From Swiss-Prot:
One of its GO terms (biological process) is response to toxic substance. This is Protein EcdD. The gene is ecdD. It comes from the Bacteria. Transmembrane segments: none annotated. Involved in the non-oxidative decarboxylation and detoxification of phenolic derivatives under anaerobic conditions, however the precise biochemical function in metabolism of phenolic acid is unknown. Keywords: Aromatic hydrocarbons catabolism, Detoxification. InterPro entries: VdcD-like. It is not known, if phenolic acid decarboxylase forms a complex composed of EdcB, EdcC and EdcD. The term subunit is often used in reference to the operon, however there is no experimental evidence to prove the existence of the complex. The keyword Hydrolase does not apply.
Amino acid sequence: MICPRCADEQIEVMAKSPVKDVWTVYQCQHCLYTWRDTEPLRRTSREHYPEAFRMTQKDIDDAPMVPSIPPLLAEGKR
């Protein structure tokens, strides 16, 4: 299995349906894309995933952190 968005092979199971074998949620450990195996091919298959939304390593490296992580407050100001 490869990630539909970035084509990485490091995919992990995030969750399984409470009813056995109904659905499974997967997450790419590289770009963090998450999908359920019951979604349409345009969301679950690299070949069908829209070109405009595919990501390269450069896209991932250049992606802004949204929302940005604020600086940690000093011990006495928490």
